[in-house]
Amino acid sequence: MTDVPSKPPQTTPPPKPKSRAPTTIFSSPPQLPDRSSLNISHTASTPTLTPTPLQQQQIHTDGNSQQPKSSPPPLPERQSFSNSPNRQTQSFIQKPALPPRDSQYNTISGSTVFKSNNNINNNNNDSHIITNGNASTSFIQGNRVTRVLNTNKSEPILQQPQQSHSPQQQQQQHTPNHQQPLSPQQQKDLAQKRSTMPLPPRPNKNRPLPTPISPESHPLTINEENSITEDKEQQPQQSAPPQPQLQQSQQNTDNSRKPIVAPPTPTIQ
């Protein structure tokens, strides 16, 4: 028997390592720069940071290429709203400037507004607006607005007709009989009457309410009850004729819608 040579075991070749970017391994965590090294400008604009040379190298270098990148352009500075010169252009609604006010009158859209404190109604809150035929509702100052549409026509103020009477006649007309001046003797008599008249009783809040009267203690109620009971007992003993009661019940049904009630049967003794 011939010996068969044994084949050596096939060994798989090791896989080729893939090409990787060079990795930077930090032995210790990176230290942050101090606040004193950062130049921060305390203004309304965005703060501009000036990095240190070590930071600059880490920012501008990439893993694949060692060439520094171009830095981004700086942002424009922001203007605060209070310091901006064109503040009216930035607002949405531009209000027109009012004409200058005078101390005596105001001219607003062709209408003259007079401020007067001594009005007919003696109301300081009134403002009189005089327009030339234009019904304009413009509240300038106060609560009430008086519009004079036609300045050519002026209505006269209504005055009461003067009565040609002597002062004695006026006094007799206006003063009634009980308000006429009294003589000194009448005044003394009236004072004596008032002193002798008894005063009306004053209401006492602390006085208790009167107790209700029981029917047993009052004799009138007992007599009334006895008289009523006697009448009730005497009614069935009297034999009343039934015919007039029937006529009354029929008349009642004609006038009002009440049911016909049968007459009571007389008790036979």
Curated annotation (Swiss-Prot):
Residues 1-16, 198-213 have a biased composition (Pro residues). Residues 46-58, 159-181 have a biased composition (Low complexity). Disulfide bonds: none annotated. Residues 21-45, 80-93, 182-195 have a biased composition (Polar residues). Signal peptide: none annotated. Residues 1-110, 157-269 are annotated as: Disordered. It comes from the Eukaryota. This is Putative uncharacterized protein DDB_G0282269. It comes from Dictyostelium discoideum.
